[in-house]
């Protein structure tokens, strides 16, 4: 069974979301996703400052098996990207919930309520587990 930490939020697209500040979330792909992808060889992420829209693609993960799109779980602005993935994309495989994180998204600080609302629409660990067919 895949590792599914209970303190994170999830999407049906196999991404995890962790609140990392008052107006910021960190995003990565789940253990299930990295396992299904196989060995990750390249991660394409947007540049810092790029606006992302919930439900729309913001990048892709390329593995030895396939290329998969990445979808923004919330709308906001990219405030950080994991530059370690440029030289070591396999961090997505070895530590998907830690060193293999993808990016941080910051919402408008005057609209933190929108972040709270967006987080409530995401899956909790139990609901995400229910979407998996292993």
Swiss-Prot record:
Q: Lipoyl-binding domain: which residues?
A: 24-106
Q: Which GO terms describe its biological process?
A: glycine decarboxylation via glycine cleavage system
Q: Mind listing the UniProt keywords for this protein, alphabetically?
A: Lipoyl
Q: Which residues are modified to N6-lipoyllysine?
A: 65
Return the cofactor note field.
Binds 1 lipoyl cofactor covalently.
| One term under GO cellular component | cytosol
Q: Which PROSITE patterns match?
A: BIOTINYL_LIPOYL, LIPOYL
Cofactor(s) needed for function: (R)-lipoate
Cited InterPro entries? 2-oxoA_DH_lipoyl-BS, Biotin_lipoyl, GCV_H, GCV_H/Fam206, GCV_H_sub, Single_hybrid_motif
Q: Which parts pass through the membrane?
A: none
Q: What does this protein do?
A: The glycine cleavage system catalyzes the degradation of glycine. The H protein shuttles the methylamine group of glycine from the P protein to the T protein.
Protein family (similarity comment): Belongs to the GcvH family.
Q: Which PANTHER family match?
A: GLYCINE CLEAVAGE SYSTEM H PROTEIN (PTHR11715), GLYCINE CLEAVAGE SYSTEM H PROTEIN-RELATED (PTHR11715:SF3)
Known partners and oligomeric status: The glycine cleavage system is composed of four proteins: P, T, L and H.
Against NCBIfam families, the record matches this protein to: gcvH, PRK01202.1
Annotated protein name in UniProt: Glycine cleavage system H protein
């Amino acid at each position: 069974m895949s590792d599914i930490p209970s303190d994170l939020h999830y999407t049906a697209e196999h991404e995890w979301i962790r609140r990392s500040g008052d107006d910021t979330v960190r995003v990565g792909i789940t253990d299930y996703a990295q396992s299904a992808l196989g060995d990750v060889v390249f991660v394409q992420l947007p540049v810092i400052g790029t606006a992302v829209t919930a439900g729309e693609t913001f990048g892709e993960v390329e593995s030895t098996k396939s290329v998969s799109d990445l979808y923004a779980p919330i709308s906001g602005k990219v405030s950080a990207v994991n530059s370690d993935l440029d030289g070591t994309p396999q961090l997505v495989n070895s530590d998907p919930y830690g060193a293999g994180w993808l990016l941080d998204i910051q919402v408008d600080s005057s609209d933190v309520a929108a972040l709270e609302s967006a987080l409530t629409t995401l899956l909790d660990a139990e609901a995400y587990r229910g979407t998996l067919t292993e």
